[in-house]
Regions:
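Small-residue-enriched hydrophobic alpha-helices in membranes
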Residues: 1-18, 23-136
């Protein structure tokens, strides 16, 4: 499991993802706050991170990086409910995935498969299988 510094880094990364091109919408804020609660980060610390991002900490565990990528996929889908500019979100997600050290083939496959699922949400088991295939 990740330590507190890594948890703050994960959350800070998600906040940066949400703020990439604009302010955080209420629905994004609530989603991120839910992730913060899952990570045992207080609301005060979460609100502080919005204005004061922490330095990116690379996750050592491949499985933790996949989980974080899945969170970003979900966040991207929330962002795009009101926005039809799918290419900006896809590019943003692709770049964040590369920065996490995930394979570009897997990221591309996830982005491609998103179109075939309801609400563009790739089920966790499908996502894991995609990355597992590339990892082996």
């Amino acid at each position: 499991m990740v330590n507190r510094v890594e948890k703050l880094s994960l959350l800070s990364e998600m906040i940066a993802f949400a703020k990439y091109d604009k302010d955080i919408k209420e629905i994004e804020y609530n989603f991120l706050l839910g992730v913060a609660k899952q990570l045992d980060i207080t609301r005060e610390d979460f609100d502080y991170l919005i204005e004061h991002p922490v330095t990116y900490t690379h996750l050592k565990s491949h499985s933790e990086r996949i989980v974080q990528f899945h969170r970003l996929v979900l966040l991207m889908n929330i962002e795009q409910e009101d926005n039809n500019n799918n290419s900006v979100g896809a590019i943003k997600l692709y770049n964040f995935g590369l920065r996490m050290g995930l394979s570009h083939e897997s990221i591309t496959k996830v982005l491609y498969l998103m179109e075939s699922f309801p609400n563009k949400i790739v089920p966790p088991d499908v996502l894991i299988d995609i990355f597992k295939t590339q990892y082996n």
